[in-house]
């Protein structure tokens, strides 16, 4: 089957689309990446997403309209990846669309029950591409008592399991998440959870203090020094004390967190603040390894993916934090994969599993009561 996996993450970099060929289903699936592209959001759409994400500035009228606008954006991104690959849209069998997360409530909070909302209307995508769309992957896991995240572990088992090596798959997107893939294990024995912020705080600080969308290659952070009082404040966040399975998002590490941090520590230089929040991402990852993983597994390899794997300062901080653990750190490209395409490929794989009516959540990672078939299916008009 030819499947387009579509992902728009918490970093708001744009729409990632992976055109993938998949043979079979389940853990024996054969997956081939044909082409990958990222279609940037235009400034107006990005601004509307940011407004929709803000509890203070969002409104139902905006979200209703944006749902359809993003559906059209996602459809156009699928057309673009096919065009770049010289691949006929008519040959496409399926689209797996994650959507844009607007709010994610993994646990009960007062009268707010666990819930999640991703937008990017699948009917618009199906109509514009004349292709079946599978979307809303997180909701069935949450209906089964899970947190709806992380969902990539199933695909990581398919792509990265090794009979002789214990591997950690560390994704550093807006949020960071880790998957433990032991030797000779089935997906139900996989451990996976969010480790905290990835690029989210780094990017927000960059935008506010340097008027830059992100710290390219970690060049600015390389110039500063870590401020202990800021790092101590960050590392005291309640999320770091929670036991897995757990997930987090912009609600905990977004604009409000950064506003409070900059207000508290405004006396420090811009460079030192950026260096310290970069260290916070690295330290939160290392903290979770040492508390929840390394006491139980001897890890042979750590494989980094996501946009954060291109931040050499962050990667060096991780290497230093793990220097005594006798494990080798790679990035996706070192082993023949793409850091950028990883999550889009994951949702192509999940769409394939849903098409075959196979469960593809990992209850040991999400906390769900059982394995479930993920996603809603939207058929094309004809």
Curated annotation (Swiss-Prot):
Family under the similarity heading: Belongs to the anhydro-N-acetylmuramic acid kinase family.
Reaction it catalyzes: 1,6-anhydro-N-acetyl-beta-muramate + ATP + H2O = N-acetyl-D-muramate 6-phosphate + ADP + H(+)
Catalytic EC class: transferase
UniProt-listed GO biological process terms: 1,6-anhydro-N-acetyl-beta-muramic acid catabolic process; amino sugar metabolic process; peptidoglycan turnover
Name of the protein: Anhydro-N-acetylmuramic acid kinase
GO MF assignments: ATP binding; kinase activity; phosphotransferase activity, alcohol group as acceptor
CDD domains, alphabetized: ASKHA_NBD_ANMK
Enzyme Commission number: 2.7.1.170
Name of the gene encoding the protein in the UniProt record: anmK
The organism of origin for this protein: Bacillus cereus (strain ZK / E33L)
InterPro entries found in the cross-reference section: Anhydro_N_Ac-Mur_kinase, ATPase_NBD
Keyword Mitochondrion: no
Pfam families in the cross-refs: AnmK
Biological role stated in the UniProt entry: Catalyzes the specific phosphorylation of 1,6-anhydro-N-acetylmuramic acid (anhMurNAc) with the simultaneous cleavage of the 1,6-anhydro ring, generating MurNAc-6-P. Is required for the utilization of anhMurNAc either imported from the medium or derived from its own cell wall murein, and thus plays a role in cell wall recycling.
HAMAP family in UniProt: AnhMurNAc_kinase
PANTHER family attached to this UniProt entry: ANHYDRO-N-ACETYLMURAMIC ACID KINASE
Source lineage: Bacteria, Bacillati, Bacillota, Bacilli, Bacillales
Top-level division of the source organism's lineage: Bacteria
Pathway listed: Amino-sugar metabolism; 1,6-anhydro-N-acetylmuramate degradation; Cell wall biogenesis; peptidoglycan recycling
């Amino acid at each position: 089957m030819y499947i387009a996996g579509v992902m728009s993450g918490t970093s708001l970099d744009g729409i990632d689309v992976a055109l993938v060929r998949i043979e079979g289903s389940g853990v024996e699936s054969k997956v081939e990446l044909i082409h990958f592209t990222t279609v940037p959001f235009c400034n107006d759409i990005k601004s509307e997403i940011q407004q929709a994400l803000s509890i203070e500035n969002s409104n139902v009228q905006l979200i209703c309209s944006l749902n359809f606008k993003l559906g059209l954006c996602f459809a156009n991104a699928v057309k673009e990846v096919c065009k770049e690959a010289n691949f006929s849209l008519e040959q496409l069998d399926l689209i797996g669309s994650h959507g844009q997360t607007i709010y994610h409530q993994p646990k009960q909070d007062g009268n707010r029950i666990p819930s999640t909302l991703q937008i990017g209307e699948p009917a618009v995508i199906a109509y514009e591409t004349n292709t079946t769309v599978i979307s809303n992957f997180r909701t069935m896991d949450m209906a089964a008592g899970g947190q709806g995240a992380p969902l990539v572990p199933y695909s990581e088992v398919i792509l990265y399991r090794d009979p002789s090596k214990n591997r950690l798959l560390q994704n550093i997107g807006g949020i960071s998440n880790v998957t433990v893939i032991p030797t000779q294990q089935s997906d139900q024995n996989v451990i996976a959870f969010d480790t905290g912020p990835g690029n989210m705080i780094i990017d927000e600080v960059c935008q506010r203090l340097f008027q830059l969308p992100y710290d390219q290659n970690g060049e600015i952070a390389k110039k500063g020094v870590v401020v202990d009082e800021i790092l101590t404040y960050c590392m005291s966040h309640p999320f770091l004390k929670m036991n897995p399975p757990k997930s987090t998002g912009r609600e905990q590490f977004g604009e409000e967190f950064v506003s409070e941090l900059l207000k508290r520590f405004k006396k420090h230089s811009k460079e030192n603040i950026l260096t310290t929040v970069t260290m916070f991402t690295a330290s939160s990852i290392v903290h979770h390894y040492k508390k929840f993983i390394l006491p139980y597994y001897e890890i042979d390899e750590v494989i980094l993916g996501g946009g954060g794997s291109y931040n050499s300062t962050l990667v060096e901080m991780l290497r230093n934090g793990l220097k005594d653990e006798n494990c080798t750190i790679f990035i996706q490209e070192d082993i023949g994969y793409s850091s950028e395409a990883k999550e889009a490929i994951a949702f192509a794989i999940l769409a394939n599993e849903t098409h075959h009516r196979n469960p593809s959540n990992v209850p040991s990672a999400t906390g769900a009561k059982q394995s479930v078939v993920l996603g809603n299916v939207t058929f094309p008009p004809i």
